[in-house]
Amino acid sequence: MTKIAFTGGGTVGHVSVNLSLIPTALSQGYEVLYIGSKNGIEREMIESQLPEIKYYPISSGKLRRYISLENAKDVFKVLKGILDARKVLKKEKPDLLFSKGGFVSVPVVIAAKSLNIPTIIHESDLTPGLANKIALKFAKKIYTTFEETLNYLPKEKADFIGATIREDLKNGNAHNGYQLTGFNENKKVLLVMGGSLGSKKLNSIIRENLDALLQQYQVIHLTGKGLKDAQVKKSGYIQYEFVKEDLTDLLAITDTVISRAGSNAIYEFLTLRIPMLLVPLGLDQSRGDQIDNANHFADKGYAKTIDEEQLTAQILLQELNKMEQERTRIINNMKSYEQSYTKEALFDKMIKDALN
């Protein structure tokens, strides 16, 4: 029996593709294990959503692009992570490794190379992240969500495969969504998502302008972990820190979304034809990957975008109004998008590329 190791973590986006592919692997009779960090969001997601597979926690350090004393400590964490991962891989003897990226993946990919285990890596963003740039040196192939990403990668290793969307995305139940929220079916629903880490600035603007927003929408507010404000209670407004199983039902009742611009999330909105106002992570918090993603979607006519540095209540409300006026055009643009690979076709390609 072929055995597959998966890795990737740090954010929801570094786990969601794995969550899409693992059930396909299991349904076809493959044995699966997951290697991630000890305390990252990937551990919570994998152990809660796929309790039947083995999860191996390893030491991991953060990859920083700036000078910091923490870098010295993290070198030792990464080295320990390589040893941890090598021990797991020697024990489990997987036939291949699929890596979704994030800093935890680098020691796993290096360990796999040292044991001659073929590795396929996946890049969701328009420009490759630092972890995948390092991992690519030890991998057999890299798959990309954006076709334009091929311009940044060696031709012999890179393949464009498009977005990989999880199986249950289109199975959301609107009736369940309205029951969960207690919302009125005859009024539009606005979903606000600040990403897995949340956005304090976006959260603050939403709360300060709830009265204006509630004139037009009912609001589902995903605040991020630890950022829910229990004191804010209004009819037509509901807060969650983070939603797992019920998210598809909430998406089924969503008319418009305000969101960060992580690749996996925005491709899910695109697949569901939900017009989106994107507020990407700024350069002070990231390498600019979400800015590239957001601008690409805006150029395609799928979304509107606001730089977080320019985000004010007035601009947010203005852009929402503009988007509602252009709603039909945006949805028609979205209809031109077609998924490149089904999960099953992508999985078959992964097996073929790794083992041939």
UniProtKB/Swiss-Prot annotation:
Pathway given in the UniProt record: Cell wall biogenesis; peptidoglycan biosynthesis
- Coiled-coil regions, chain positions: none
Q: Which domain of life is it from?
A: Bacteria
Whether Transmembrane counts among this entry's keywords is: no
Q: Name one GO biological process term.
A: cell division
The record's top EC class is transferase
Q: Which reaction does it catalyse?
A: Mur2Ac(oyl-L-Ala-gamma-D-Glu-L-Lys-D-Ala-D-Ala)-di-trans,octa-cis-undecaprenyl diphosphate + UDP-N-acetyl-alpha-D-glucosamine = beta-D-GlcNAc-(1->4)-Mur2Ac(oyl-L-Ala-gamma-D-Glu-L-Lys-D-Ala-D-Ala)-di-trans,octa-cis-undecaprenyl diphosphate + UDP + H(+)
Kindly state which keywords UniProt assigns to this record, in alphabetical order.
Answer: Cell cycle, Cell division, Cell membrane, Cell shape, Cell wall biogenesis/degradation, Glycosyltransferase, Membrane, Peptidoglycan synthesis, Transferase
A Gene Ontology molecular function term for this protein is: undecaprenyldiphospho-muramoylpentapeptide beta-N-acetylglucosaminyltransferase activity
Q: Name one Pfam family in it.
A: Glyco_tran_28_C
**Its membrane topology:** Peripheral membrane protein
Locate the residues binding UDP-N-acetyl-alpha-D-glucosamine. 166, 196, 290
The places in or outside the cell where this protein is found are: Cell membrane
Q: What is its EC number?
A: 2.4.1.227
Return the InterPro entries for the record.
GlcNAc_MurG (IPR006009), Glyco_trans_28_C (IPR007235), GlycoTrans_28_N (IPR004276)
Query: An example Gene Ontology cellular component term from the record?
Result: plasma membrane
Q: Which family does it belong to?
A: Belongs to the glycosyltransferase 28 family. MurG subfamily.
Primary role = Cell wall formation. Catalyzes the transfer of a GlcNAc subunit on undecaprenyl-pyrophosphoryl-MurNAc-pentapeptide (lipid intermediate I) to form undecaprenyl-pyrophosphoryl-MurNAc-(pentapeptide)GlcNAc (lipid intermediate II).
Q: Which NCBIfam families match?
A: PRK12446.1
Give the protein's recorded name.
Answer: UDP-N-acetylglucosamine--N-acetylmuramyl-(pentapeptide) pyrophosphoryl-undecaprenol N-acetylglucosamine transferase
Q: In which organism is this protein found?
A: Staphylococcus aureus (strain MRSA252)
